Amino acid sequence: GVAIADNPEGPYEIQPEPIKGINGIDPCVLKASDGNHYIFWGNGRCAKLADNMLELAEDNPKTVMKWRDRELEMVGVNCLEGLPSRQAEGPFAFEYNGNYYLTYPYVRENTEVIGYAMAKNPMGPYEYKGIIMAEHENGCWTNHHSIVNYKGQWYFFYHRNDYSPNFDKSRSARIEKLYFNEDGTIQEIKPTERGVGPVKASHKVQIDRYSTIDGAAIEYL
């Protein structure tokens, strides 16, 4: 579905019809440097939006997929084709320094990790690069995410269930700083209890972020 407003804070007017041709959840819209908008949704599909952003562009590729006893016309492309996914949802796409990034939760072993792939075109093909955030130690499935650049610093927003380990629907919002390597790849993020806010001098300081020792354990001063 689509809702429209003149300001980010609203009020929003819900449009009577959803965007036709999208069969999935967890949409993400990317405004690319080529001037077009692209929409990504669950299971790694991507399509270009029309200028009105209420429908898909006419020049999107189309494929036919057999599902049970029916044939379904699929619009756009499968950006996860050839990438490790098993089960994927919650994609988030962004652009940085001439590269397009497709980030997404997927099941690597038992629960979800955040993986990512890179491309030179918004619709791929994408090359898998690795993990941004590994599985939570308590096995929760709560790491849907967003990535934002604010005043020159990149931030990684996600959620976990540390405060309700026996019930994965009570989730808390988290934020960590995100850093790139010189080749454009993303450094793996280790979740912290500190986040990105200022720390009082009288409080314990989690020093993992200040150590370059590979595999160093989290310690406190």
State where each predicted segment sits.
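Carbohydrate-active catalytic/glycan-binding domains of CAZyme proteins
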Residues: 1-221
